[in-house]
Curated annotation (Swiss-Prot):
GO molecular function, one term: glutamate-cysteine ligase activity
Protein name per its UniProtKB record: Glutamate--cysteine ligase
UniProt entry tagged with the keyword ATP-binding: yes
Enzyme class: ligase
Family: Belongs to the glutamate--cysteine ligase type 3 family.
Cystine residue pairs: none
Organism: Onchocerca volvulus
InterPro entries in UniProt: GCS, Gln_synth/guanido_kin_cat_dom
EC number: 6.3.2.2
An example Gene Ontology biological process: glutathione biosynthetic process
Pathway the protein takes part in: Sulfur metabolism; glutathione biosynthesis; glutathione from L-cysteine and L-glutamate: step 1/2
Keywords: ATP-binding, Glutathione biosynthesis, Ligase, Nucleotide-binding
This protein's GO CC annotations: glutamate-cysteine ligase complex
């Protein structure tokens, strides 16, 4: 969702004079916060998920489905309920926040989950409650689905319908496909971001996704944009054999699943940030769920590169298309991409790609007492300009506010995010795991969340290290998006498990990883083991669970989640992307030309909706699992958690 500040957002031309000021004071704010809270210790493990949902409207007579632009109306009702509960002293089961599009809402648990394994047994139940809470407010024909809508940008894809205005200079996006009304209008952040990204870049964003070449797909596949009313931008930008898109909404209008963890202190947060980073491509491949864009089958299964291009505000100079004149750097990546550096001291030698940063900002951080590795990370983020400046919020007290820092931090969308505590808050140092595609059902989303959280427990308990050169991560994220990557791609990964008390980490920050310690592995080998040097992540998790204090129901639920992910990794169960491809290919109206028409999408989403509601089973996608998820943690377990909290506070 990002930072939602109240005020008057400045257009890009009015933002430019404040860019250096915002950066300088954003760094000053981080330095002040760091020194105030760097010694914070003893925070309990807390975590939570964020799921983005799409509201759709089925027209059963016309056999078509559209996105329903009622998010703002629904949010008013949902948030009114939150406020009422707060006044009455009642616990909120879940919280609701706006997202980029007028058809999207973001749901989170009402309070973070705690550190006990029993918390895993309430996750799925909470997700079920979220759907039910929204469903009660929906109109006839509407449904809430945790999917990325496959027909974004096609004619008449919204309810009610609106027309794009590519030749309107007052349009936020000037898109050929994506009307301004589809951007969430309840907060100025989203429309202002669309406008400022376009204006900073100097033209519309250009998204080109390789099209899936079916037997009847034209070769070359080329759309004709010569008559488009956008000054020739589409005709120049669209690539042959690619699906062309031209708006932030094609990326940020896709739904995702994210998990945030609170660490015990800043050192653990930095360490977890590094250790989870190599896992991000694995989860991207495992969660593949987005094979269709603009009603065309793509040759990728993920939204990752689409989002990256959809917010790419780099100028022609920064993209290396013309010599540098007004800008400082040629930037290799969009501001939405993979992380370029590790931040824990032991990981420094694995930062094997050049890191760009402004020397002045880096010096400000070093002079402010920030260590070299963290200073590089922050300075690298601050090569990006702030895209969102509010007129009333320019002057701030840098010792009390972090708004200028968050303005830049929250618009650097990486696969991992290191999150300092908010000012004057009980919240501690956190890391956010960001690559996962949202899944169709609550069971799947709960399984992926619990997998990642349990992995952090294994990492911390066994002190295992999965670090590999950061350049390998960049390559892995490219491979993980490809069609059927979970079965057909190999990812660079550690040959065997090392610990932070054994070589290479024990040798300190100057250690290096021998080249033959990194090998190519399938996702199945990473998850389930290769029978040789690498035991597999889930066997390690089961080993951890065998020695953990966990109640029977929670162990049963977690075991089913792990078994499910093992079968996804092995190919015994399909990813949603694979399931969708199969459904489309077998549909009688599909002409094997890569085009997925209205009726096909209607039938497919109707089937998906019934699966997500539990009205029909889908063994190919989900197997035959049934967890013991419950909305409440047993009282005995809750008391044990309270004792853990008290014990932790005494130790700190």
């Amino acid at each position: 969702m990002g930072l939602l500040t109240l005020g008057t957002p400045l257009p890009w031309n009015e933002t430019v004079p404040y860019v250096d000021y915002i950066k300088e004071h954003g760094i000053a704010q981080f330095i002040a916060l760091y020194h105030r809270l760097k010694g914070r210790e003893g925070d309990q493990l807390k975590w939570g998920d964020e799921i983005e949902y799409t509201i759709v409207k089925f027209d059963d007579d016309a056999k078509r489905v559209r996105v329903s632009l009622r998010a703002e109306e629904l949010l008013h009702q949902l948030q009114a309920g939150e406020e009422l509960n707060a006044l009455l002293g009642n616990e909120n089961c879940c919280l609701w926040r706006p997202e980029f599009a007028s058809y999207m809402i973001e749901g989170t648990p009402g309070a973070p989950y705690g550190g006990l394994l029993a918390c895993f047994n309430v996750v799925e139940s909470n997700m079920i409650s979220r759907r039910a809470e929204v469903t009660r407010l929906l109109e006839n024909g509407e449904s809430i689905m945790s999917i990325s809508f496959p027909a974004l940008g096609t004619p008449d894809f919204t309810s009610p319908p609106y027309e794009p205005r590519p030749d309107d200079i007052n349009s936020f996006g000037c898109s050929l496909f994506f009307p301004d009304e589809v951007i969430y209008g309840g907060h100025p952040r989203f429309r202002n971001l669309v406008r400022n990204i376009r204006q900073r870049r100097g033209e519309k964003v250009a998204i080109n996704v390789p099209i899936y070449k079916d037997i009847n797909t034209p070769s070359p596949y080329q759309e004709d944009f010569t008559k488009a009313k956008d000054g020739g931008q589409a005709a120049r930008a669209a690539k042959s054999d690619h699906i062309y898109m031209d708006h932030m909404g094609f990326g940020m209008g896709c739904c995702c699943l994210q998990v945030t963890f609170q660490a015990v202190n800043i050192d653990e947060a930095r360490w977890l940030y590094d250790q989870l980073t190599p896992i991000t491509p694995v989860l991207l491949a495992l969660s593949a769920a987005t094979p269709v864009f603009r009603s065309r089958l793509a040759d990728v299964d993920s939204r990752w590169d689409v989002i990256s291009a959809s917010v790419d505000d780099r100028t022609a100079e920064e993209r290396g298309l013309v010599p540098l004149k007004n800008n400082k750097f040629v930037l290799e990546k969009s501001r939405y991409d993979t992380t370029d550096c590790y931040i824990y001291p032991c990981s420094e030698s694995y930062n094997d790609i050049p890191l760009q940063y402004d020397d002045k900002i880096y010096k400000q951080l070093i002079d402010g007492g920030i260590d070299d590795l963290l200073a590089q990370h922050i300075a690298h983020m601050f090569i990006r300009d702030p895209l969102q400046v509010f007129r009333e919020r320019i002057e701030q007290d840098d010792t009390k506010s972090t708004e200028h820092f968050e303005t830049v931090q929250s618009s650097n969308w990486m696969n991992m995010r290191f999150k300092p505590p908010p000012p004057d808050s009980e919240i501690g140092w956190r890391v956010e795991f960001r690559p996962s595609e949202v899944q169709l059902t609550d069971f799947e989303n709960a399984a992926y969340c619990c997998f990642v959280v349990l992995l952090t427990r294994v990492m911390i308990s066994f002190r295992i290290t999965l670090i590999l050169p950061i350049s390998a991560l960049t390559e892995n994220m490219k491979r993980a998006q490809r069609r059927n990557a979970v079965l057909e791609q190999k990812l660079l990964f550690r040959k065997g498990i090392a610990t932070c008390n054994s070589p290479p980490c024990a040798r300190g920050a100057g250690c290096t990883l021998e080249s033959d310690d990194v090998v190519e592995m399938t996702v199945n080998e990473i998850i389930n083991g290769n029978g040789n040097d690498f035991p597999g992540l889930i066997p390690l998790m089961r080993q951890y669970l065998d020695s953990a204090d966990v109640d029977v129901d929670s162990r049963c639920t977690v075991s089913q989640y792990l078994s499910f992910i093992q079968k996804r990794a092995s190919g015994e169960l399909q990813t949603l992307a694979a399931w969708m491809r199969e459904f489309i290919s077998e549909h009688p109206e599909y002409k094997h030309d890569s085009y997925v028409g209205d009726r096909i999408i209607y039938d497919m989403l109707k089937e998906m909706d019934r699966i997500s509601k539990g009205e029909i089973s889908c063994p190919k996608l989900l197997g035959d699992y049934c967890t013991k998820t419950d909305s409440r943690i047993p009282m005995a377990v809750r008391r044990a958690e309270e004792k853990l909290i008290v014990s932790t506070k005494k130790q700190s």
